[in-house]
Structure formats: structure tokens, C-alpha cells
């Protein structure tokens, strides 16, 4: 009798993706974050589904429905805390996953990389519309400020903003459509993630050395299934600790106040995972320029494969590029800090310098470092 795992039309696909998949023998823990993102997505969809059963997308009852979930629904407080902090875990894994791709040259799988950038943008859109749903002060004003940025688009800007709002301000129509988007987008993310995997399995995984791993591959199961399981346990441990002991650590206190269009919070700021982009947006004193810089801060990832100048794929044996990579990481942390600070000196100038450095590192310095390192490796005969 033939093995069902290898013959059944559906099980065969799962087998080729997660069981008999030939995998490089030397991929490190940095390769765990793809599967962790899968688990994050499943957690978010499940907790979100249960929240949606009790939530009402109406300006008069949205805030109360969230309070009702936390007070009256069985384990509603836990479901809500897991969903809110699950978003933070999702973005932590995303940033590490993208960072790993940059460090080890995984972006040279261009199709996989481009789908990944689209995935990142989709997850950011989902998180943004989701943040509006509790209808607290920061939800309302965050939605107002960010959607208003579209009015910077010449000619069609104002019409576009009113079209998205469904009226002349952020109101019931906006909340209802944002709930609809927040419900549908995770399923689109799931479909895109499958395409992401499809493209990845066309080429096989990269590895820390950046060399061709075909000469030394091992089956995904049991080696990497057990390694992924360890990652799942550690991530769920961190998530549960966060959700149980300090669920509001990463949230904004202003969101405990119901939305009030007549009262603006002193500092409007998004969740921590958007602060780096928000700092870049604020560092340009022109509205349209700021919006373009905000878009560029994410879309610059698309051109990274074109900026690869080195003969080596990975940064593993390239100390100058390694230094620049960690400088970029520190710079992003600086931008995240600046995004949460008020618009006053010295924060304005620090934000502007960090924004300039961000683009300079990616577009100018890292390609130059790649060329320099190649030059240093060339044997110089007298």
C-alpha cells in the first residue's frame, strides 16, 4: 500500500511543505520567525473571531462593547489582551524576520521578498484599522490624523479623504467600514502568506552562509518541526506573560477615554510598531513631503535587491556591512523613541538626522560597503 502522505492530493502538498521539505542543515534560530508569524496570524484570527462575536461597530456602543467583553464575557479580558498584545508580538516577529532577510541576503529571492513587502504593508493596514475599533480617544484621533494625510495628494486628496470617511469627519460610517476591513484583511494576509511560501519553496531556503546549500539538506520533519515547536512555546510564554501581568504596557492611556471629537489629546501617537514611520513622517515640515517619506520608509524595502552590490550574499563574512546593519537597527530604535516624543527641540533635530541616516544607510552606505569589501578581497599582485 502506498503511503497516503505521499499520494493524497491535499496531504501531499502539506507533506512537501512541512514534512519532506529539503531544508539547509545550518539555518539558525533567526529562521524561526516565519513560522512564528504563522502562529501569530492564527492566534490573531481566532481571538479576533471571538471578539467580533461580542463587538458592535457603532460609535455609540463600540467603547461600551469592548468594556462589556472585558467585564461580562467568559475570559473576554484574556481574549482581548491576547489580541491586543498579539499584535505587538506579530510586529516584533515581522521586524526580526525582515531584519534577518536583510542581514543574510534573503531578498535575492525577489518574488518571495516582494510578496513579503506587500504582506508587511497589508499587516500594517490591518493593525491601523484595528486600532480604531475600540473607539477611544487615541483610536479616533489616530484615525483622523492618519486618514487626513491623504488630503496631501494633489487634486483628488480632499475627495479621497471624504470618500474613505464616508462623510465629512471620522464617524459611524468610518468605524463600520474599518471593522469590515479589519475582518477581511487577515484572510487576505493568510492567502498572501501561502503565495509567499509557494515562491519560497520554488527556490528553497537561504542559510546563514549565503552559499548554495543543495549539497547538505535534511528533511524539515523532525529536525525543524521540533525547533519550530520550541519557538512557539517561547513566544506563547512571552505573549501570555504580557497579556496576564501587564496587558496595558504597550497601549496608550488615552484609549481608556471614550472618543470625543471636541477634545484633542495632548500628544497624538500611534502604537509603538508605527512610531519609526511616524517619526519619519513628522521630520519633514511639509505635508505631502512627509507622506512621501512615510511611504518611502517602507517601500524602500522593494529596491533593496537592486542595491545589492556585493559578490557575497550574506553579511556573515562582511564586517563593514555588519556594522552598518547594526547602525541601521540602532537608528530604527532611535526613530521609535523619537516618534513617541512631543514635537519640540531637541527631538525635532534628532528625528530629522535619524530619518536622513535611515535612507542614507540603506540607499548609499550599504551598497558602497559591499563594493568596498569586494575590493578589499581582490588579490593585489605587484
Curated annotation (Swiss-Prot):
Keywords: Electron transport, Heme, Iron, Membrane, Metal-binding, Mitochondrion, Mitochondrion inner membrane, Respiratory chain, Transmembrane, Transmembrane helix, Transport, Ubiquinone. Heme b b566 binds at residues 97, 196. It comes from the Eukaryota. The chain crosses the membrane at residues 33-53, 77-98, 113-133, 178-198, 226-246, 288-308, 320-340, 347-367. Binds 2 heme b groups non-covalently. One of its GO terms (biological process) is mitochondrial electron transport, ubiquinol to cytochrome c. InterPro entries: Cyt_b/b6_C, Cyt_b/b6_C_sf, Cyt_b/b6_N, Cytb/b6-like_sf, Cytochrome_b, Cytochrome_b_C_euk/bac, Cytochrome_b_N_euk/bac, Di-haem_cyt_TM. It is found in: Mitochondrion inner membrane. Heme b b562 binds at residues 83, 182. Its main location: mitochondrion. GO terms for cellular component: mitochondrial inner membrane; respiratory chain complex III. The keyword Membrane applies. It is a multi-pass membrane protein. A ubiquinone binds at residue 201. One of its GO terms (molecular function) is metal ion binding. Coiled coil: none annotated. Its cofactor is heme b. The cytochrome bc1 complex contains 11 subunits: 3 respiratory subunits (MT-CYB, CYC1 and UQCRFS1), 2 core proteins (UQCRC1 and UQCRC2) and 6 low-molecular weight proteins (UQCRH/QCR6, UQCRB/QCR7, UQCRQ/QCR8, UQCR10/QCR9, UQCR11/QCR10 and a cleavage product of UQCRFS1). This cytochrome bc1 complex then forms a dimer. Belongs to the cytochrome b family. Component of the ubiquinol-cytochrome c reductase complex (complex III or cytochrome b-c1 complex) that is part of the mitochondrial respiratory chain. The b-c1 complex mediates electron transfer from ubiquinol to cytochrome c. Contributes to the generation of a proton gradient across the mitochondrial membrane that is then used for ATP synthesis. Heme 1 (or BL or b562) is low-potential and absorbs at about 562 nm, and heme 2 (or BH or b566) is high-potential and absorbs at about 566 nm. This is Cytochrome b. It comes from Marmosa lepida. The lineage of its organism: Eukaryota, Metazoa, Chordata, Craniata, Vertebrata. The gene is MT-CYB.
